[in-house]
Amino acid sequence: MNALIDADVHITWQDSNVFLSYLPDAWKGRFTQGYGHSETGFALSQPFFNPLEAGRPEGESDPDALLQWMEKTGTTACVLHNWRAPAVGNFGDTIYPGHLAEAYNRWLCDHWLSRSPSFLGSIVVAPGDPDAAAREIARAVRACPQVVQVSLTPGTLEPYGKPRFRPIFRAAAEHGLAVCLHAGAEGVGVCNPPTSHGWPRNILEYRVTPATNFIAHLTSLITEGVFTDFPDLRLLGLEVGGILPLITYLWRFDKNFKALRSEAPWLTELPSAIVRKHIRLGTHSTAIGDPEVYFKLLESFGADDMLLW
């Protein structure tokens, strides 16, 4: 029997004081006052993009409830995320978010991963200090073997292919972890607006743009040679706008690479081949019209095995 793994299960805490206990005393005041608080500090994250009514914490904060659901549905394992946590990468400073990331990772290990071997962890790091982020990856893996992934915010000031981010990808590759870009923190904090033309006025506009941010990072990671440097590295895109936008994107990427490959002489494969080898995308169960047409589109560029649930 094949394993059924849910790659994107959202978790949180019901009481922020539980998380607060993992922060050094010097930073607790900043957390409780809301300057960087994961629930209220980013004013944009709740009233504009994520209304409280969209998801109550009760269902996301009970490990026993998740285990019961897994048994009922036949789910073998779950990769656990806190959708707010990657926003530690959206601060203007680099010290406080590093402490937030470590606090979250310790909380994840103690309150969830220790409860069941079926729980797998997606830790977070603060990419503003890549060397510190790499050290946190090593610490978290040593502390908790059920860590399988590093989550990064797709909302940044620079694309992730830039050399300054190499320590993060090196650490992930050395420890056998996937790297995940999970949509949801674009335009939060000090990062760029969530669209290339600035700020949208409503959630409708925002919800149709995550693919553009993911594609920008993906183009940078491929062109700058990250997957050449780390041939075993895997990148996941979760809630980033689906796989179908990649079809026309990869056609154009391959086309331009053939004409401009002298700018990236370290690449020995077409971008589409690199994507098929290194990239996986999450999807949700949803009505897709005619499944036969859908799967023909996936097969058209060899993506029929790129989807995660």
Residue ranges and their predicted role:
Residues 1-309:
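Helix-coil boundary/capping segments in enzymes
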